[in-house]
UniProtKB/Swiss-Prot annotation:
Signal sequence segment: none
The protein's name: Ion-translocating oxidoreductase complex subunit A
Cellular compartments annotated: Cell inner membrane
Naturally occurring in which organism (per UniProt): Yersinia pestis (strain Pestoides F)
Pfam families: Rnf-Nqr
GO biological process, one term: electron transport chain
Lineage: Bacteria, Pseudomonadati, Pseudomonadota, Gammaproteobacteria, Enterobacterales
Gene that encodes it: rnfA
InterPro entries: Ion_transpt_RnfA/RsxA (IPR011293), NqrDE/RnfAE (IPR003667), NqrDE/RnfAE_oxidrdctase (IPR050133)
Family as reported in the entry's similarity comment: Belongs to the NqrDE/RnfAE family.
Keyword Lyase on entry: no
Keyword Transmembrane helix applies: yes
EC code: 7.-.-.-
Length: 193
């Protein structure tokens, strides 16, 4: 149990996919203008990342490795992610039409989110077992969601703040993301792998 807790804390805080590994920056910058949208995107990404991580592990363990098709890993994982995203899109459309409209084009873009593919590839490269894959996928998604919600809350405050003209919009957003990344560097050394 301690191993899974360390994996969770290490992935969420120490090795955050957005602020440390710089994966998933497109939705991080694009969907974080409103807190409501960021929460929805975080939930959708959490579902997709966790499910895609487990499915990718199963495809790798039960199909690619036994058949010696390791060279097809990236292509196979992209297909797995596309199927999981389509399934998620159907679920979100049926359960929350408002969230589906708010997420707009960003929901199908989860397919091309490099964080999802990155988690799947790192998962198999680190030789995780099934349970570790599930925890790693969920932890990466939790870290992504945490950073996204914090960033959206800050951006909402910045939207009404008196920011100098040269720093408005994207400039202040990038500066804020950099400062958040520096803050997360404070967690370095918290968990040793």
């Amino acid at each position: 149990m301690t191993e899974y807790l360390l994996l969770f804390v290490g992935t969420v805080l120490v090795n955050n996919f957005v602020l440390v590994k710089f994966l998933g920056l497109c939705p991080f910058m694009g969907v974080s203008k409103k807190l409501e949208t960021a929460i929805g995107m975080g939930l959708a990404t959490t579902f997709v990342l966790t499910l895609a991580s487990v499915c990718a592990w199963m495809v790798n363990s039960f199909i690619l490795l036994p058949l010696g098709l390791i060279y097809l890993r990236t292509l196979a994982f992209i297909l797995v992610i596309a199927v999981v995203v389509q399934f998620t899109e159907l679920v979100v459309r049926k359960t929350s039409p408002t969230l589906y409209r708010l997420l707009g084009i960003f929901l199908p873009l989860i397919t091309t989110n490099c964080a999802v593919l990155g988690v799947a590839l790192l998962n198999v490269n680190q030789s995780h077992n099934f349970m570790q894959s599930a925890v790693y996928g969920f932890s990466a998604a939790a870290g992504f969601s945490l950073v996204m919600v914090l960033f959206a809350a800050i951006r909402e405050r910045l939207a009404v703040a008196d920011v100098p003209a040269p720093f408005r919009r994207s400039s202040i957003a990038l500066i804020t993301a950099g400062l958040m990344s520096l803050a997360f560097m404070g967690f370095t050394g918290l968990v040793k792998f």
